[in-house]
Amino acid sequence: MRQIIYDKVKYIADKYKGYIDTEDLMKEGLTNRQIGLLTAEGKLDKVAHGHYWIISPEFSKPEDYKAVEVARVNRKAVICADSACYYMGLIDKEPEILSIATRRSDRHKMKMNFEVSRHYFSEQAFEDEKHVFDTKYGSYNVYGIDRSVCDCIRFREDIDKDIFELVIENYRKYDKKNEERLMAYAKAMRIGRQVERIGLDR
């Protein structure tokens, strides 16, 4: 490719400093063919359909890049279950698979460069206890700790055993837990007896 294209990529990197969509790349004068070639050459990292990370020695991806990238693909998706417990600080080990929640009616494709476990929620359950994390790369949604612990029990078969045990152990010691809120959510999700058997109030 001609040097003028590489100069343009450097200009784009300086301007956007990270994530950029196909639409903006084309607004900056790149063609689909050039975008494909730049991706093959390692100048662009395709994080999902229509979304890229500009590779530059001057900056690197944020630690929470998985959450940021999911939100760029589907801004209404919510980090849930074990992953939410990590982002909310209950556990310090990041699950390898990112757990995300979407509405049952959500038809967004969530094909990412990393593995995700997608869970579908009813309208009412989807809206409960959402927190918004604002970053310079955009915002993303995360469920609160009490409901996320409950979701871990609900989706136990989809969660790494060691991560699940860490969530339960840490929640038992968590001094800000709201058992009333957790049990209300558990009963609404029809897993009240499962939660009681585990004994989160020890």
Protein language model annotation of sequence segments:
Residues 1-6, 33:
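FIC/Doc superfamily catalytic core
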Residues 4-8, 19-24, 39, 54-202:
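Nucleic-acid-binding surface
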Residues 7-16, 44:
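Basic, Lys/Arg-rich alpha-helical nucleic-acid-recognition elements, primarily the DNA-binding modules
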Residues 13-30:
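Polyanion-binding surface elements
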Residues 28, 51-53:
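Glycine-rich phosphate/ribose-binding loops and adjacent secondary-structure elements
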Residues 28-40:
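Short amphipathic alpha-helical interaction segments
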Residues 42-49:
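A short, conserved structural fragment
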